[in-house]
């Protein structure tokens, strides 16, 4: 049975890549594509919007009218829109892949509550490489973390609206958890003026926003006389889109539950 996938935010940079990824993947098909209410893209063919030719799927701004056309919704939009989509998917028993970042604690709690009813993969980054980096960071933190200074440096395009990136925060969380620290109290997100000497147990974050950078993350484990750097650089959004489709296919036989890419890629067994 073919899994029918819908894309939220179909007209955005990520949405168009997701349409391409669904179209090129085996075992899935594009069932619906959505944009915000009143968008000028409503009625446009999703395939033509994504540059892959006519697909016969018109962009809609009404999930209710399209609910019989898809089994799973992939959502890389903004928190306020994603929360509306989550409520719809719970009410209509639709699975979700959520790549939206910038949720506050209430938003994350809503995702957790929804997963009692439907199956959700929620991740800050759907790149296979980034998720492998998460595991490498845990191993590096276990060996070096208590004896060095840890800094997370990230760069993205000028249009990104949240900082630090969700991926950078996830990196910090993986490190903090390994070291038994709370990122809320040990994370340092801004340094300016007379800050005093750096504390050993800090996890620092630096953010760059410039041009069309897709996404770059580097973590320093810096000790006196040596420094280990673990980096990931994305050159195309297709790596995230392909990962999201892979996650959707993995969810196909799941009734409910909250998962991330560690589950999809079985990284806990590394």
From Swiss-Prot:
Native organism: Haemophilus influenzae (strain 86-028NP)
Pathway: Amino-acid biosynthesis; L-lysine biosynthesis via DAP pathway; (S)-tetrahydrodipicolinate from L-aspartate: step 4/4
MF terms (GO), sorted A to Z: 4-hydroxy-tetrahydrodipicolinate reductase; NAD binding; NADP binding; oxidoreductase activity, acting on CH or CH2 groups, NAD or NADP as acceptor
Alphabetical UniProt keywords: Amino-acid biosynthesis, Cytoplasm, Diaminopimelate biosynthesis, Lysine biosynthesis, NAD, NADP, Oxidoreductase
Subcellular location: Cytoplasm
Function as written in the Swiss-Prot or TrEMBL entry: Catalyzes the conversion of 4-hydroxy-tetrahydrodipicolinate (HTPA) to tetrahydrodipicolinate.
Main location group: cytoplasm
GO cellular component, one term: cytosol
Residues at which (S)-2,3,4,5-tetrahydrodipicolinate binds: 157, 166-167
Alphabetical list of InterPro entries matching this protein: DapB_C, DapB_N, DapB_N_CS, DHDPR_bac, NAD(P)-bd_dom_sf
Active site: 156, 160
GO biological process: diaminopimelate biosynthetic process; lysine biosynthetic process via diaminopimelate
Database matches in PANTHER family: 4-HYDROXY-TETRAHYDRODIPICOLINATE REDUCTASE 1, CHLOROPLASTIC-RELATED, DIHYDRODIPICOLINATE REDUCTASE
Protein name according to UniProt: 4-hydroxy-tetrahydrodipicolinate reductase
A Pfam family assignment: DapB_N
């Amino acid at each position: 049975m073919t899994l029918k996938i819908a894309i939220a935010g179909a007209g955005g940079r990520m949405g168009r890549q997701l349409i391409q990824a669904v179209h090129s993947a085996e075992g899935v098909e594009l069932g619906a594509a959505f944009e915000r209410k009143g968008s000028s893209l409503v009625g446009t063919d999703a395939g033509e919007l994504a540059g892959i030719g006519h697909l016969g799927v018109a962009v809609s701004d009404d999930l209710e009218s399209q609910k019989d056309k898809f089994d799973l919704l992939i959502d890389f939009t903004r928190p306020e829109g994603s929360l509306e989509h989550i409520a719809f998917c719970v009410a209509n028993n639709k699975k979700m892949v959520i790549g939206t970042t910038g949720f506050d604690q209430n938003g994350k709690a809503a995702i957790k509550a929804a997963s009692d009813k439907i199956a959700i993969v929620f991740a800050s980054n759907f790149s296979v490489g980034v998720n492998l980096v998460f595991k490498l960071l845990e191993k590096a933190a276990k060996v070096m973390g208590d004896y060095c200074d840890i800094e997370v440096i990230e760069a993205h395009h000028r249009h990104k609206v949240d900082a630090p990136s969700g991926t950078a925060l996830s990196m910090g969380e993986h490190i903090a958890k390994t070291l038994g620290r709370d990122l809320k109290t040990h994370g340092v997100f801004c340094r300016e003026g007379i800050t005093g000497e750096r504390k050993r147990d800090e996890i620092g974050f630096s953010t760059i926003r410039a041009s069309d950078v897709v996404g770059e993350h580097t973590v320093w484990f810096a000790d006196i006389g040596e420094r280990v750097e673990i980096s990931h650089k994305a050159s195309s959004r297709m790596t995230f889109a392909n990962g999201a489709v892979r996650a959707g296919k993995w969810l196909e036989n799941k009734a409910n539950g909250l998962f991330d890419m560690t589950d999809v890629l079985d990284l806990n067994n590394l």
